[in-house]
Amino acid sequence: MPHSKLILTPSPEAALPPTGQVVERLSAIGLTRETRATDVAGQAAYLAGDRFLQLITFLGCSPFVRLEPEHPDDSEFSHIRIRGPFAEPLFRSGPNTTPPRCPVCRHRYVHWRELAEQDSFNCEGCGANLSMPTLNWRQSAGTGRLFI
């Protein structure tokens, strides 16, 4: 089964609450429930809460969503992890990341991975000063200090 992810992160301007408050709030709204296990980095994995399927919509003609592990080492089910907070924003992308565009002129960056190590660069289309976070990722990648 492919590992699909939905990553949520607070806006860059938002003050980051302590992780404990994030965990409590996610549980209070019914997105999560008890901790299932910890991964090799010691980060908790939370089981889907009672309102998980009301808060997150899975599209398709007949999506199959497993909410419980079938065995102790199972990771092929829907669960929630919290990463961070990190001192500096981290860039997140995946194998299905679409090429971003310049927010000024809409120039398309097909070879965006080559730019990932640069702090800033000038747009090939209009010359605007850009960075990875300022590109229009169309919700397929982005940066953050806290990831859910």
Regions found by a protein language model. Give the residues of each.
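N-terminal alpha-helical interaction blocks
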Residues: M1-R92
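Generic detector of ordered, mature protein regions
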Residues: T35, D39, N136-Q139, T143
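Short glycine-rich, basic-tinged beta-strand/loop micro-motifs
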Residues: P2-P10, Q139-I148
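Aromatic-enriched hydrophobic runs in primary sequence
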Residues: R51-F52, P63-V65, P100, F121, ...
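Cys/His-rich short segments
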Residues: H79-Q139
